Amino acid sequence: MTDAHEAPWKPKFNPWLIALTVTMATFMEVLDTSIANVSLPHIAGSLSASHEESAWVLTSYLVSNAIILPISAWLSTIIGRKRFYMMCVALFTTSSFLCGLAPSLGMLIFFRILQGVGGGGLQPSEQAILADTFPAAKRGMAFAVYGMAVVLAPAIGPTLGGWITDNFNWRWIFYINVPIGILSLFLTNRMVEDPPFLKREQERRRRIRADYVGLGLITLAIASLQIVLDKGQEADWFGSPWITATTILSAYAFLIWIVWEWHHPNPVVDIRLFQRRNFATAMFFSFTIGIVLYGTTFMIPQFLQVELGYPAVKAGEALAGGGFAMICMLPIVGALVSRVDPRKLMAFGFISISAGLYYMSTVFSLTMDFRMALLIRTLQLFGLAFIFVPQNILAYVGVPREKNNQISSMNSFMRNVGGSIGIALISTSISRIGQQRRAFMVAHTAPGSPAFENMTNGLSETLKRQGASSADATRQAHGMVSALIDRQATTLGYVEVISILAVIILALVPFLLIMKRNKPAVGDQAVIH
């Protein structure tokens, strides 16, 4: 019986039990991308390392994780998806335990690399498993479950990491993965299975010579890019020779890889899928949403902690509220996507996010309180719920089911790369715009100007009443005005970047016209309508 006329495959166990099983490990993996952020000072102190050295605890994980994402589809096909997924869970769980035991920073970084390798295959594997386990008409709800894990985990990561570190020890942010990983291994072995068409593809691939050149090129390109994005701001970007050289290396490796993969009969990553308009547009959306989602996830706690003096746990709570709001919306969108044109849902989502960002730009100030921070994050993620599920659905439209691994792998990769680029660009833009605004404000608040004199005189009188001498009061007043200018200039940098993001998201709406809607087909991929 040919693939075209093969009866629809159904798993032996309830699809929802399978969905919950594969979501557990994915949730812990995504959680680990952010849970260590607030624990870095404790890790550095415990292991006698500087802040710059301890930052490699994050960078090492992100680099190895990013390398595995695009090649996970190839590895799934070669090894077998279930076997590959279980190997990833086992490696992630074991390396998490070893991270907790690490006696030195060097050993911790090494184990974090292994943890990133194991974790990199979990997101795309889960998405592919869900796509094959559920019929096309029910994928919306399945992807809603996946979305809960991907969105909630980074939102609560800093809060959970701060709470664990404050109440126990930083090593427990790694130990908590172990029992969940063991449970995931047991349930996966029991419930998950590879569909027949995937097994046939695996047998076919075994007789084909592996594309080691493509594998080497994409590894070099992604590792170089991730290091540039993570260390660029710290090294003054292209003012640093090694950042410039690494950027050139990454660009050339990507270009050569694209040409090589395009002409290779059995590539590691099937980039010819970008010839399909739905797939290409969905990946563009995934990349852009990654910029905004991860960028704002970086911006809000950064502003609350640095400019407003919030503790890390409290800043993390501002993100968690939005994550819980999205969890409430995802099942609703999952149900709507089979009844409403997904493109209309995405248009509503883009407009909602853009409006939320615009509102955020109007209230983002040094007087913003916690409730306002919670509200603006909730407005953003409310709109994102209307994009996440439909975008995942439309990415599969018209693509053979044998390519499900490739779709899920590339989707996760584009979102994560967009996030890395977004954080780097946003961080740099805030700094550069802030410097420009500070120069402008200093020029208009120089000694002698009425505004400057009124402010410094008022502060000086207050300090004198508190016991400071006239000279000390004047000097301290000048310092306080300078610090206020710095904070206000930085805030303006945030506001301008947020406004730019609002325009970018709104500009995505016309691109929906490129996509063709899906019409669920029984037992096969959704077909184009």
Please place each PLM-identified region on the residue numbering.
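Helix-loop-helix hairpins in multi-pass membrane proteins, especially solute transporters
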Residues: 69-214, 324
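Small-residue-rich alpha-helical segments with characteristic i,i+4
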Residues: 143, 152-158, 162, 373-457
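Residue-level hotspots within transmembrane alpha-helices of multi-pass secondary transporters
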Residues: 38, 70-71, 155, 159, ...
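Short, Lys/Arg-rich, polar N-terminal cytosolic tail immediately upstream
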Residues: 1-10
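Structural signature of transmembrane alpha-helices in multi-pass secondary transporters
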Residues: 29, 58-61, 65, 92, ...
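Transmembrane core module of solute transporters
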Residues: 13-79, 85, 100, 106-109, ...
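C-terminal membrane-cytosol helix-exit motif in multi-pass small-molecule transporters
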Residues: 179-198, 219-230, 249-263, 509-516
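Hydrophobic transmembrane architecture of multi-pass small-molecule transporters
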Residues: 2, 53, 416-517, 526-529
